């Protein structure tokens, strides 16, 4: 591993990924951000691409190798919320897009990252799933299914690469305050007819701490998991959700 951590973050120009990038930079890392659009946080390199495209991902990792000289940490974070509604109203295109962005991209990035991490003598892979990938999530079946798949990929990869000093863990954020959660609530309000304010209140009541998670909370956990302090943490699914244990009990109540 290099003296200065070399970190690649997909979906790093906004939301959770941007918070991760800022946190790693503050921790002294060299950070490369990949996203479909946007501007990089200060101190980061940036590539604009679709990380569900295999050729584009190959080009990304070639550039990461040329720019940073290797890789120590992959944060496979990119994701979309997917369509909202009862399953009978969802179309195949929405399902396929959600799986491509949320699952295919993680696979493509991991298969390129592992050889680079082995060459570096070890490292860390962090995949971003969701509490929806543990509990399920009514009205969001494509998203929940994709996030279950991310956990399966992460757990399996941890078994495969631990012997090479590569640790693989999964972050499961709860409802994250920001534009994406706002859009999800608005879409659900349109489908269900429930006012936006009531839905937001219901989401908050599902959490023991009665507030949404912030990107910086997930970013802090990412920096820890990539650090030597977490050198024996591997194959774990870690929720950063404020205690979101009541979702199953509030559906349709």
Cite the ranges covered by each PLM segment:
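Substrate-binding pocket helix/loop in short-chain dehydrogenase/reductase
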Residues: 85-87, 94-96, 203
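Short C-terminal tail/terminal secondary-structure segment
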Residues: 81-84, 234-253
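Residue(s) in the substrate-gating loop at a strand-loop-helix junction
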Residues: 130
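Active-site loop immediately N-terminal to the catalytic Tyr-X3-Lys motif
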Residues: 87-88, 135-142, 163-164, 210, ...
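Short, small/polar-rich loop/turn modules that mediate ligand/substrate recognition or access, typified
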Residues: 162, 167, 233-235
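C-terminal helical subdomain
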Residues: 170, 178, 193-233, 240-242
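Active-site helix of classical SDR
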Residues: 110, 146, 154
């Amino acid at each position: 591993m290099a003296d200065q951590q070399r970190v690649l973050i997909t979906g790093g120009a906004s939301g959770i990924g941007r918070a991760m990038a800022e946190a790693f930079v503050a921790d002294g890392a060299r950070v490369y951000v990949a996203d479909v659009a946007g501007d990089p946080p200060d101190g980061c390199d940036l590539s604009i691409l679709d990380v569900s495209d295999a050729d584009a991902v190959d080009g990304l990792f070639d550039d990461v190798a040329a720019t940073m000289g290797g890789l120590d940490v992959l944060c496979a974070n990119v994701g979309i919320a997917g369509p909202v509604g009862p399953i009978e109203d969802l179309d195949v295109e929405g399902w396929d897009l959600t799986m491509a962005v949320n699952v295919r991209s993680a696979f493509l990035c991991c298969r390129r990252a592992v050889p680079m991490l082995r060459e570096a003598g070890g490292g860390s892979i962090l995949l971003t799933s969701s509490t929806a990938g543990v509990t399920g999530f009514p009205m969001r079946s494509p998203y929940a299914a994709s996030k279950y798949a991310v956990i399966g990929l992460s757990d399996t990869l941890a078994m495969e690469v631990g012997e090479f000093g590569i640790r693989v863990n999964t972050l499961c954020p709860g409802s994250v305050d920001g534009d994406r959660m706002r859009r999800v609530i608005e879409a659900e309000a349109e489908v269900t007819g429930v006012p936006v304010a009531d839905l937001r209140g219901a989401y908050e009541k599902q959490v023991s701490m009665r507030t949404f998670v912030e990107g910086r909370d997930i970013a802090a956990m990412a920096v820890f998991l990539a650090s030597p302090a977490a050198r024996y943490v591997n194959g774990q699914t870690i929720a950063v959700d404020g205690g979101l244990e009541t979702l199953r009990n509030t559906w349709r109540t």
